[in-house]
C-alpha cells in the first residue's frame, strides 16, 4: 500500500496528512468517495463500470471510503473490519480491461476536481491510484 509521497525538498508525508490528517482527511476522503460514486452513477462515460456494481451503492461507497482512508495513510478502517483488502481477488469476478480501468480513473479524477484538490496533490494521487487500477485488470 502506498501512503508516503515526496513533498518539496526532503519532507515526507502521507496523502492522509496532506489532506488534513485526523482533523480533515477523513472528511475529505468521504467527500471524494461520494463525488466519485456520484460521477459513476450519473455520467454516461462510466455506464459500463456502473453496471458492475449493485443498484444500491451504499456498501461500495463505505468500503471504498474505508479502504482509501487506510491506503492514504490514515486509520486502517477496512482492514479492521474486513481483513486484508485482497483487491485483485475481490475484483476477479468482474471483467476489468483497460477501458474499465480508464473509466474508474475518469470518475476519480472528476471527483478530485469537484472536491477542489490541489493540482500537485491530485496529480501524485492519480498516478498512484492508476497503478492500483491497472493492477485490477484481468483482461
Give residue ranges: language-model regions.
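Core of compact, soluble alpha-helical bundle domains
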Residues: 1-139
Amino acid at each position: 500500500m502506498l501512503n508516503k509521497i515526496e513533498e518539496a525538498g526532503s519532507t515526507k508525508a502521507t496523502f492522509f496528512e496532506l489532506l488534513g490528517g485526523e482533523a480533515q482527511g477523513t472528511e475529505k476522503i468521504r467527500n471524494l468517495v461520494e463525488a466519485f460514486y456520484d460521477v459513476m452513477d450519473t455520467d454516461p462515460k462510466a455506464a459500463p463500470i456502473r453496471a458492475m456494481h449493485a443498484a444500491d451503492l451504499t456498501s461500495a461507497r463505505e468500503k471504498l471510503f474505508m479502504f482509501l482512508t487506510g491506503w492514504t495513510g490514515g486509520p486502517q478502517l477496512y482492514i479492521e473490519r474486513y481483513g486484508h483488502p485482497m483487491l485483485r481477488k475481490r475484483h476477479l469476478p468482474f471483467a476489468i480491461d483497460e477501458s474499465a480501468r480508464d473509466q474508474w480513473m475518469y470518475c476519480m479524477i472528476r471527483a478530485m476536481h469537484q472536491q477542489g484538490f490541489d493540482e500537485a496533490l491530485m496529480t501524485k494521487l492519480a498516478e498512484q491510484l492508476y497503478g492500483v487500477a491497472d493492477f485490477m485488470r484481468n483482461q
